[in-house]
Structures are given as C-alpha cells and as structure tokens.
Amino acid sequence: MESIFHERQEGSLCAQHCLNNLLQGEYFSPVELSSIAQQLDEEERMRMAEGGVSSEEYRTFLQQPSVNMDDSGFFSIQVISNALKVWGLELILFNSPEYQRLGIDPINEKSFICNYKEHWFTVRKLGKQWFNLNSLLMGPELISDTYLALFLAQLQQEGYSIFVVKGDLPDCEADQLLQMIRVQQVQRPKLIGEETAQSRDQRLPRSDVDQAIEVSHPFDGTGMLDEDEENFQRALALSRQEIDMEDEEADLRRAIQLSMQGSRQSEFSNSLPQNASQPPHTSQTDSLSSEDLRRRRQAYFEKQQQQLQQQDLTLNLHDKPTINSSTLEADPGGDMSEEDMLQAAMNMSLESARNHLSTEEKK
C-alpha cells in the first residue's frame, strides 16, 4: 500500500489530485491546468467572435466568468480531458448508450474518473486489485472485484458522473509490485479530518448541556437507547417514583394527625358542654352527641349492666369520688393532656349513666 501514489485534498484542487492519482505521479500542477483552461477559454472566445465582435452574444460571453476554472481551484471536465490527451488517454461516459452497447465488464477496464458537485476522484486498477484513490481519504481504499460493480452503481444512484479512461496508462512502481503480490486491508481509511475530529471530541469534556441534548435526541432514527442512556432514564424514573411516594406518605401522615386531633377535640367539646349545662338526671343520648363515644359507652355499659344490677343501687352514689363538670371547670384544661381530657369525658358519661340507673330503680 505504501507504494501507491495518493495525493490528499488541498483546497479545491481535486481535479489535480484526480489526474495525479490516476497517473501515479506528480504529473500536473495548478499552473499547468490553469494554462490548459486559459487555452480553452481563448478557443471559445474565438468561436464566439466569428458571429461578430459587436454582437450581443459576444459581449455577454466576455462578461461571464470562465467555465473551465475558477479562483478556488476548480477545473472542468474539458480541462481534465485535454490534460489526458497529452498521454494519449480518452474519456468515455460510463452510462452512455455507446459504451453500454459494448457490454464491457467494469472489472476488465483499467480506471474510472468520477465527478459529483465539482469534486473529482479516481478509481484505478493496480496490479490485479482495484483501489479508490479519492483525495478526501487518508489513503487508498481497497475495492474487491465483486464489489466494484456495486460501488459504481451506488455512485450512479447518488448522482455521480462516471467516465471510463481508455488508453495505456504510464508505468508505475505500484502497478508492477501489485502484479506479483496481493494486498489486504483490515480497516477502511478514514476521511480527512475525521480522525482529528474524533480525537478532539475525546479530549474535550462534555458539558451538561451537551449530555442533556444527547439524551433528549437519542438516536439518529434508530429509536434505540444505549446503555448509559437507559440507565439514566431508569434512574430518573425511580427518582420520580420515590419523590411521589414520599409526598404521598407525608400527606397521609398529615391527614392522620389532623384526623386524630379533630376527633379528640370533637369528642371532648361535645361531651364537656352538655354535661356541664344539663342536670344530672338527663339521658345518655342527650348528654353526648358524638357517635363514636356513644358506641364506645354503649358497649361498655352493656358489659357492666349485669354487675351494676347485682350491686346495691340504693347506695349513695354521690358519696363516691367522681369527676364532674365542676371539676373540669376548676381545671380549664391548660395542663391536661388529650388522654386526660378523653378520660374525663368518659368518667362524666359514666356518672350520668349511674344517675340515670339510680333514678329508674327508685321509680
């Protein structure tokens, strides 16, 4: 591969690189190609002058720039064709009806020149193998015989113009060497600037914005996430779930706390005013309005009713120490806990029940 002559792209001098890679040597320079282009411009001017130098067509032609070259280094197919005539070489359009009628297998040709949007490059056979000598590549690219036809068909489909080079090419060292040996290429050569761009991307740390853009735009049409992106998305989903669970648990704890506080305050407030304002002989239903306390007291009274009937109900129940409304009024509850308040309410309810049973027994 080292013996193959390969010029790399400089500016827009692809026509020069195409010719030199085809001929396998530094045969043409920009100055020589510019001279050929100027000769073509002069020949065209002389043909236009035959119609009269005062004609509108001639004046318009003089005002237009050259179609054979420009300041960037581009050269037309006419310049390349005239340059090859010096070496007895001729260009034939590959997909022209005249060439297609010949029915020649591309493998049996010697070289091709390809053009697309003002870029020229050579595909040539050296020894017994084909090589893509595109000046945009870092080096020659090996093309197998079976792939050559597909390669040319792909270029045509992409809009390339392909020309077959007819004639005997100058002898070169690479052609002689590759007649004796065959080369193998493990890795395709990279484009010029591709390796530099990759190494620069590896050296520069990615910012958070670049990483975010990379995650939110996955995927170049494949719809697949790589491993890092999948892990990131999974961690993000788990984080959101944990936050939602924590919020729900916090809301639940606050709701339970408020419910317990409201229930205790309601039980105490419903029992305290009614027992304090009503006489001791009011009924159990009138003394407490809280449904929960009523159910609790009713269950308790049913369990104790038989025991109370067996005891002497004529005893002076008022002599027993009880907690009545006056006791609660004496202690406004500034130092009482919620449990003390609940116990006081239960004792008051029990006192009311006992008074009621005593009244019924006397009747």
Curated annotation (Swiss-Prot):
The keyword Nucleus applies. Gene3D superfamilies: 3.90.70.40, S15/NS1, RNA-binding. Coiled coil: none annotated. PROSITE patterns: JOSEPHIN (PS50957), UIM (PS50330). Residues 227-246, 247-266, 337-356 form the UIM domain. One of its GO terms (cellular component) is nuclear matrix. The active site is at residues 14, 119, 134. GO terms for biological process: cellular response to amino acid starvation; cellular response to misfolded protein; monoubiquitinated protein deubiquitination; negative regulation of TORC1 signaling; positive regulation of ERAD pathway; proteasome-mediated ubiquitin-dependent protein catabolic process; protein quality control for misfolded or incompletely synthesized proteins. Keywords: Hydrolase, Lysosome, Membrane, Nucleus, Protease, Repeat, Thiol protease, Transcription, Transcription regulation, Ubl conjugation pathway. It is found in: Nucleus matrix; Nucleus; Lysosome membrane. Residues 260-290 have a biased composition (Polar residues). The keyword Calcium does not apply. Its EC number is 3.4.19.12. It catalyses: Thiol-dependent hydrolysis of ester, thioester, amide, peptide and isopeptide bonds formed by the C-terminal Gly of ubiquitin (a 76-residue protein attached to proteins as an intracellular targeting signal). Residues 192-212, 260-363 are annotated as: Disordered. Pfam families: Josephin, SUIM_assoc, UIM. One of its GO terms (molecular function) is ubiquitin protein ligase binding. It is a peripheral membrane protein. It comes from the Eukaryota. Residues 1-180 form the Josephin domain. PANTHER family: ATAXIN-3-RELATED. The UIM domains bind ubiquitin and interact with various E3 ubiquitin-protein ligase, such as STUB1/CHIP. They are essential to limit the length of ubiquitin chains. Deubiquitinating enzyme involved in protein homeostasis maintenance, transcription, cytoskeleton regulation, myogenesis and degradation of misfolded chaperone substrates. Binds long polyubiquitin chains and trims them, while it has weak or no activity against chains of 4 or less ubiquitins. Involved in degradation of misfolded chaperone substrates via its interaction with STUB1/CHIP: recruited to monoubiquitinated STUB1/CHIP, and restricts the length of ubiquitin chain attached to STUB1/CHIP substrates and preventing further chain extension. This is Ataxin-3. It comes from Gallus gallus (Chicken).
